[in-house]
Amino acid sequence: MKPKLILIGGGGHCKSCIDVIEQENKFLIAGIVDTNRSICDLLGYPWLGHDDDLANLKLSYDYALITIGQIKSPAIRVRLFNYAKSLGFKLPVIISPRAYVSKHAKLGNGTIVMHDALINAEAIVGENCIINTKSLIEHDAVIENNCHISTGAIINGGAIVKQGSFVGSNAVTKESVKTNEKDFIKAGSLFKGYANE
C-alpha cells in the first residue's frame, strides 16, 4: 500500500503540487494542513488541521510536503519545513513523471519538480525547493536550499542560486554566475550576477 502524505499549506501552489503527486502515483494524499479552514476539500482532499496540529498528526502520518508557495520571502516555507523536520516527518522528493531529472543530478529532501521541468547532469538542488513547470536547471548548476525556480526560468550551466532565492517566470541566468542569498530575480529578466571565483 502506498504511504500517506500530508500537504502543509493550501492555495494555488498546493493545487499544482496535488496534480504532480497524483501523476507520480507514489503517495496517497491524506489531506491538507492550513491556518485557513476554508480550504477544506481542495481538489477533493480534506482539511486536517492547523499548523499547531502537526505534532498530533505525526502520530498518524510519516510523510509531509510543504505546499505553500514562495515569491517575496522563503520565511514561511523555511519555518514549516524545519518544524515538520523537527517533528520527525519524512519530507520526500516529488518528481513529476513528465519532468526529466538526470541520474547524475542530486535533489534534496522536500523538493518538488513540476511538470516538464528539466534538471541536467551534475546539477545540485537543495532541500525544500520548488522547481516549477517548464524550468531548466542546466549541467553543474547549484540551487541551494529553500529556493523557488519559477515557471519557464532557465538556470544556465555552472550558475549558483543562493539559498532562499526566487527566480521569476522566464528569467534567465547567464552561465557560471552567482546570486546573493534571498535574491529576487524579476520575471523575464537576464541575470548577469557575479562571476564565480
Where do the language-model regions lie?
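Structural signal for interior beta-strand "rungs" in well-ordered beta-sheet cores
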Residues: 93-197
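Hydrophobic, well-ordered beta-alpha structural blocks that scaffold small-molecule cofactor pockets
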Residues: 1-42, 55-58
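Small/polar loops that bind or transfer phosphate-bearing groups
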Residues: 9, 68, 175
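Phosphate-bearing ligand-interacting subdomains
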Residues: 39-96, 100
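Short loop/turn motifs at secondary-structure junctions
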Residues: 1, 26-28, 60, 88-90, ...
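Short amphipathic alpha-helical segments
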Residues: 18-20, 77-80, 125, 197
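Short alpha-helical
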Residues: 12-13, 72-75, 106
